Amino acid sequence: MPRDVDAVYALLLGRSALQFMRQYQEFGLKGRVKLIGGGTTTDEHVLPFMGDEAIGAVTALHYSASLDTPANKAFAQAYRARFKKVPSYYSESMYTGGKWLVAAINAINGRVEDRAALLEALRSVRPSDLPRGPVELDAYGNPIENVYIRRVERVNGELQNTVIDTFPKVSQFWTFDPVVYLREPLYSR
């Protein structure tokens, strides 16, 4: 690896994230080259199995268990009480999906057999009090939501993804015009 790189970007899941963090430190890169990455690299489901090698890693994701909002605090507290662990992106996503579905079903008074009405309700509802913050769907059915920049820190003896910045209302197109963006050719190897 060239010595003048600004950072290493890692997007890993599960065991691979654990191994990578250890190897990053063992190879002497921690403290010398910034580590940035996708949120699953340091998700709360793997943090309990990591040590100080993860401290300082900066990742981006639409959820952090340490998000300081009333909705997330209530969710994280209830989750921890029931499952004896910190909620992860995966558990929060399932919870949010469930709240979304309930809101849509309520919006159509339970008429789930009316497929068109259910799909329209799923596209148009905006459930409140989601742990991750506000979410809505764009015209293409993809989420517009906050993306949190998180840094791994040790707080009260536990590793956590501390939110250090927020990009509000991020869509699949980021800052690009959707019409222009969709005219581009598909990615291909």
Please tell me what each predicted stretch does.
Residues 1-189:
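Extracytosolic ligand-binding ectodomains
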